[in-house]
Amino acid sequence: MNAHTTLLWLGDDPLHARPAAWQTRWARTQGARMVLQHADPVPLRGDWLVQLESAVRSAPRCRLVAQGLGCALVAAWAAYSSSWARVESALLIGPFCPDAAHPSGRYRTWRAVTPMRLPFSSWVIPEPSPRSHLAEQQQWAACWGAYWPGPLDPAGQREAMQAWWQDMSAQHTFF
């Protein structure tokens, strides 16, 4: 990553975010700018989309790292924003893509993510979750045209994230 590239971290929604989780610590050690969901207990899709658009527009180039609900945000944003060309790549960890009909009622401002190939290279790193099964995460990876390494233990997740971070040229061999 060059000096003109910004790493943007889109964490999970506040109910499920774990500030001490290794993924969050990893993003912070890489100098990531946090673009977090502010609404609690109901995450607001529109508010977070505006924050992401502003963050991307303020950077000449950026990489996105998203976890859980943040992955749905990236997909929704890429479907409408013309700023996607500033994104070098995206790392999507354990995607969770609810819609307004989600049984919890917490996602009433969210719409179903439009199944489409993302306009930038991406990796989906699977993460076991009661909200999003691995098979569903693999389906999102295929839909988005993302590299899918298969199920990984936590050590494998960290290795995959480091590979994505350190070797952009290796990523392009997957696309």
Question: What is each PLM-predicted segment?
Answer:
Residues 63-66, 90:
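Conserved alpha/beta-hydrolase fold motif
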Residues 143-175:
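C-terminal catalytic histidine-bearing segment of alpha/beta-hydrolase fold enzymes
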Residues 65-74:
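Gly/Ala-rich beta-loop-alpha elbow adjacent to hydrolase catalytic centers
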Residues 2, 55-60, 84, 168-175:
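Glycine-rich phosphate-binding loop signature in dinucleotide/nucleotide-binding domains
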Residues 98-145, 149:
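The feature captures the conserved acid-bearing segment of alpha/beta-hydrolase catalytic domains
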Residues 2-61:
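Active-site catalytic motif of lipid deacylating hydrolases and related acyltransferases
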Residues 84-100:
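A conserved short beta-strand
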